[in-house]
Amino acid sequence: MPIDRIIAKDDAFAICVEGGHIVVLGSNANGTAYGILELSRLAGVSPWAWWGDVTPLRRHYLALASDYLTIQWPSVARRGFIAQGHGLDSHRLHQLLLRLRGNLLRHADCDGRGAKCMEIGERWLPSTQPGRIYAEMKTAYDQGARHEWVARIDNPRTVAYQLSLFMDMAWNITYVNATNIPSHFHAWLTEQFGEQAADRLLPVLTEYYHLVGIRRPEQMNVEFMADAFGNELERYLANYEALVKALTPIAALVPQERSEAFFAWVDYPVRAAWLMAVKQLQAQEARHIGRPSSFARDDEALSSAVRSWTAYQQLLALNRKFSGMLDGKWEHTLSLAHMPLMAEPKFPGPLSHDAIKRFAQQGPEPFNLDVGNTITRNACHFRRATQGVQTVSMLGHSMKAVMVPPGGSLSYSFFSELRGKAVVRVAAIAMPDYLGHDIRLSVRVDDGEAQIVSVRPDAHSPQWQTAEQRGQVIVNVDVNLTRNSHDIEIRALDTPVFIDQLMVDYDPVREFYIFPVTAEQL
């Protein structure tokens, strides 16, 4: 028995087979509990059995190989979360904490040397990209945050995978790396819904995190441009609708005992995010097109308004279904009073029953991407990178943002068919720096002077609030191009910088929201 390998480590455990018996060893009470709960995982009991309604499937026995051995101990000494939601069962929270191999349930923010607190505060839908959790926490760990990790959440049920990823990294920092986040997500989905469903769910939910990474549903109060790049608004909605259509055949692969978990963690978030996007963006389009004096006769504005109104009615019905599931077990968790965007959409004028009937079957229109006079690419398609550069899966609008270490750089080349004024737009992802350093990057075009910009988070800055909601900080560098080959160099100066996308735009005053990257470049 490997007692000597765990006895000097806090919260460690070992599981082995001795004389035909399964043996669990713990270095302390926590370690023993973690070991026993590890056995329950091996038997198919999810840590989310109660919080996620992941009903355990019946098994007749648990068998381990005669040479089975696992020895585990934590990478971070104190691991846990702050649950700020109302009416949460403290006993159930402590059970979940143990099942996630945590040892700290805080009621106030973490503080002190070696401590790191991360905000995963969604109160409605899960919208923090998995790559964001990995990037922020791994960077903090590398900078010395190894004593205490705390996730600030509202309700653990809402952010089940995010909290699982956070706690898994705190337990063993090597579980996840920059490129295997999708594999970790697949393993988690398999634990909840089975491998067959997980195989089909992974691409669907990866695209879900792509779309919510472009804009969080609870912040869908932004203008997408119908006249930008071949109608970025309709393409965004069409991508959402494709996800919704993919859910029905997958649901049939989920065991009946897990159907409530599938609805709460997959069906509801995807559909609700889609309906919120349709509701908000089509209402915006109706207001943009229509005028109060002519709204009742404006078929284009009416079509957008009816699509928005229909989505709103469907969203209300979906919320009622969520609140009523399992005899209202989770009704109190869906408090949407704090969300102004959940209100009825506003149009230039009233909608008649006749208009609703006429345009009720309207859906997203097919629009092909038109990159116009731009050269656009995701940052991961660099020509050259210095040592230490890493592509991070499931992060950014590209879902492949690039981490550039201090002093490191990315280089790109392009050929300009046009000459004259242009702007180089660089989309970075601002991460809070654990050590409090400034977060600066420089952008140099050809042999010109490097433009140095800070992308450090500043909660008091309106520009930062816009960037936080967008998920990107846009750095613009004015250039005067010749018809020739050109080079762009992006360098991190103080701390790691995450670069997402870049664009050479020959229309410096262009209004748009989404960088026009083709599907082949994703």
Where are these regions (language model features)?
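Beta-sheet entry/capping signal
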Residues: 21-23, 78-80, 95-96, 102-104, ...
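An acidic- and aromatic-residue-enriched active-site/binding cleft used to recognize and process polar
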Residues: 27-29, 86, 102, 107-114, ...
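Substrate-binding groove of N-acetylhexosamine-processing glycoside hydrolases
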Residues: 111-385, 485
